[in-house]
Amino acid sequence: MELPIAQFPDVQANRPKIPINLTRVGVTGVKKLVEIKRKDKRPIVLISTFEIFVDLPSDRKGANLSRNFEAMDEVLEKAINLPVYEIEKLCNDVAKSLLRRHEYATRSEVRMKSEYVVKREAPSTKMKCQEVVDIFAEATATRLEDGDIDVKKLIGAEVVGMTACPCAQEIMRDNAKTALRELGVGLETVMNFLNKVPMATHNQRGRGIISLEVSGDVDVSLETIIRIIESSMSSSIVELLKRADEALVVERAHQNPKFVEDCVRTMAQNIVSEFAHVPDSALVTIKQINEESIHRHNAFAERVALLGDLRDEIKNN
């Protein structure tokens, strides 16, 4: 004898007491194991944290949150079976799936954060080590009037490096010049010394952040973003350093002093040169945060612009 199937009431579909729209309803802190396959390379395995939202119309009491997990798991299983997959593509597909499952929603958002391990080597001894980079991706899907779904996707990274202050270095350079002249050292010898040996200055641990938001099937290389950020500061940093490596890192940083503003401008220039295939409509966000060593405050600089505007500025200046 078959038992009757129980029909449970859909409480979420009821009309709320206060009928107003909600911008975001969903779940946060969702941890998932994500396997990103790469062509001719070993897959990348990430433990990722997701935020998943849809908008909610005024005539619904709540959203069916279980559908968020259904959409996520469906796309993750699909990703495992594909030869190549990007994290922004993952968010893109989840955002689309959310709108298909939440028929009452007109907008969905998916945000993903992970720690990505990259291989590095010490500059002098060439010893191998691993560095951890924070990566993130987002996708926002909008249901159009004709029923199609438009998606904007974003990918970015945050990388830690080192900067040396140009201002304090010039002060120390001037002090060294005066002291050497008072000791009777000739001016030509003093200038040769100062040009060869970088002067002391205070340092910062810098955090560079780049994100690019694009539409359609435009690919943005995460590895390129990471490389641009690393090269924008006075020096990259390495977890494992022997004495020879440490001396070289410090020397490099002091030979390449940079303000927080310099880092952002360098990143902007390199984005323009490295991402020639990305359309002008891409939204670029560049940030640099330098944690000061001799102050309690941190230094900050940012540029937000369309890629086309950055191209015009750099070309015309």
UniProtKB/Swiss-Prot annotation:
Gene3D superfamilies: Urate Oxidase
Cofactor, how bound (note): Binds 1 Fe(2+) ion per subunit.
Site description May be catalytically important, residues in chain: 165
Keyword ATP-binding among record annotations: no
EC number(s) per entry: 3.5.4.39
InterPro entries: GTP_cyclohydrolase_FolE2/MptA (IPR003801), GTP_cyclohydrolase_MptA (IPR022840)
Cofactor(s), by name: Fe(2+)
Catalytic activity: GTP + H2O = 7,8-dihydroneopterin 2',3'-cyclic phosphate + formate + diphosphate + H(+)
Subunit structure: Homodimer.
Cross-referenced HAMAP family: GTP_cyclohydrol_A
Free-text function comment from the UniProt entry: Converts GTP to 7,8-dihydro-D-neopterin 2',3'-cyclic phosphate, the first intermediate in the biosynthesis of coenzyme methanopterin.
Name of the molecule in the record: GTP cyclohydrolase MptA
Organism: Methanococcoides burtonii (strain DSM 6242 / NBRC 107633 / OCM 468 / ACE-M)
Taxonomic path: Archaea, Methanobacteriati, Methanobacteriota, Stenosarchaea group, Methanomicrobia
